[in-house]
Amino acid sequence: MAALSCLLDSVRRDIKKVDRELRQLRCIDEISSRCLCDLYMHPYCCCDLHPYPYCLCYSKRSRSCGLCDLYYPCCLCDYKLYCLRPSLRSLERLRRTTNRILASSCCSSNILGSVNVCGFEPDQVKVRVKDGKVCVSAERENRYDCLGSKKYSYMNICKEFSLPPCVDEKDVTYSYGLGSCVKIESPCYPCTSPCNPCNPCSPCSPCAPCACGPCGPCGPCGPCGPCDPCNPCYPCGSRFSCRKMIL
């Protein structure tokens, strides 16, 4: 548990660091207005206003974008965003790793699963529970203008996993949380196998006879030897043995 806590703290620090860099890029994007490179590059761009990971202009743009360099030197499709791509990929990996660790840790054992739906709005995400399986799907439509015409592209994901045998379909809930992550939860803690009720205590059985068998009756005591007529003996069974009285 100590190693798991250290790993989670390290992951959280890395996520906070990358989030700070992303907030700085958002501030730069708010300063600049609509990107003018969509005239030439928009067939390859998935967004209209350049939010951080969805702009793909840098993947197809030429060595120097004349419109951006002339009017918007702070455009997000410049060399800075190109260099930030590894950080963005690293952030997504960290988020996926964190979700898996949290889903498998003991403190969140009521979480049946989590699906990363980054890039989709909450109303675009659908969760369906049927036949002991959970299906999470999301779909969106991208529309952009290219040389006076409109073009459309579609993006969708679909994830499916099975429910544990002890979870009822009616008890499954889901929530759209931070980090664009859909969490599938159950009110009770899932277990790997159905819990067995405690066995009632069996009534006490009568004491069994000794293994050596019932005790045999005591053999009859041997009769006392005939007493000396001159010396009467003590009655049989006394603590003193028969003896002669010497006068």
From Swiss-Prot:
Family matches, as InterPro entries: A-crystallin/Hsp20_dom, HSP20-like_chaperone, ODF1_ACD, ODFP
* Chain positions found as Phosphoserine: 5, 10, 64, 87, 108-109, 137, 153, 175, 180
> Which effects follow disruption of this gene?
Absent sperm head. Does not affect localization of Ccdc42 to the centrosome or sperm flagellum.
List the SUPFAM superfamilies hit by this protein, alphabetically: HSP20-like chaperones (SSF49764)
Keyword field: Cell projection, Cilium, Cytoplasm, Cytoskeleton, Developmental protein, Differentiation, Flagellum, Phosphoprotein, Repeat, Spermatogenesis
Region entry 2 X 5 AA repeats of [RC]-C-L-C-D: which residue ranges? 34-78
Q: Which cysteines are joined by disulfide bonds?
A: none
Primary localization class, coarse: other
* Protein name (record): Outer dense fiber protein 1
Q: Which organism is it from?
A: Mus musculus
